Amino acid sequence: MNFGGFATPERNIIFDINDLDETLPAPFEWDLKRLAASVAIAAEHLALSKSDAARIVTDVVREYRERMCNYGWMRALDVWYDRIDLQKYEDRTGDPEIVAAARKRLAQRIEQEKRKNVPDHLYPKLVSEEGEQPRIKDEPPLIFHPTEDMAPGLGTDYSEAIASYRESLPEHVRVLFDRFHFFDLAIKVVGVGSVGTMCAVGLFLAADNDPLFLQVKEARPSVLEPYTGKSLHANHGERVIAGQRLMQTASDVFLGWTRGRNGRDFYVRQLRDMKLSAVIEDWDTGMLRQYGRMCAHALSRAHARSGDAATIAGYMGSGQTFDDAICEFAMEYCSQNRSDFRAFVSAIREGRVEAQIES
């Protein structure tokens, strides 16, 4: 659903939108429809009844609408400073037992991530010191060093791309970045949502082998461009970062962008940095509802920052008509998703689509 927890520069854990590869100015309801449809599909995945799924989706849309109404009455600075602190989050209508259980699990996850993401933990897992200088370990097929055939034009001299990235950083962050020196870069296999794009991990070291791991991810034209027009940004990495800085309440200090010698655009951020994502497999109705409302809260806050909250709230109104309309769309989308998946599986079985099934 493109929402999750991550660390702020102050090392607090907040909940927010965490994937903005397609970000572009567009109608607010497109994002809300996508969230509502995702919740409906998640409910079906959990084998919840259609009536339960519809109630959860309606609750999620209502949360968005009511939060947006509140933002419409708030001072501009208060909207801008508002954030969802995961460790202090209070669900306004959730079951106290569910909230308490979720908070306990969250505290355990946060402690696990803190241990996993400290440099002393990451460095020995990702870096080998067997050669003349530190080097990222090859772990094919997930992490490997590119050849010219694998990545035409990527080359081995990244000085121009690094200099361009440095220029994209705020001046005060450049002072910090200049303490680190580039040592290595390796290709990193991306997730399902980014298949076909290039992603790499860069190793930078300061004094005493103090590491900084940067993820360099390809940014292509937004899928929204055919419907909204081209981005105002010449570099699509800049488009992603501009949207991220606008809509997130706090962002990675190393967010930046660059362009490779092969003409590809990239955006840059720290690798990992205490990222928390939802694992819904063992969830029940109450937990999905709570998570969906948190997503709606984060989305409404992002839209209130980037748009006019009062205008959006006025468009949605104070009744349930808007909620029901979005819910109807989400349930129909879920049905279409189910039909599409069945057709996909059928095509595999009939040999019309090749697929590799991992054991």
Predicted regions and their residues:
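Conserved ATP-binding subdomain of kinase catalytic cores across diverse folds
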Residues: M1-R115, E160-S359
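Long, low-complexity segments enriched in small/aliphatic residues
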Residues: Q87-Y158
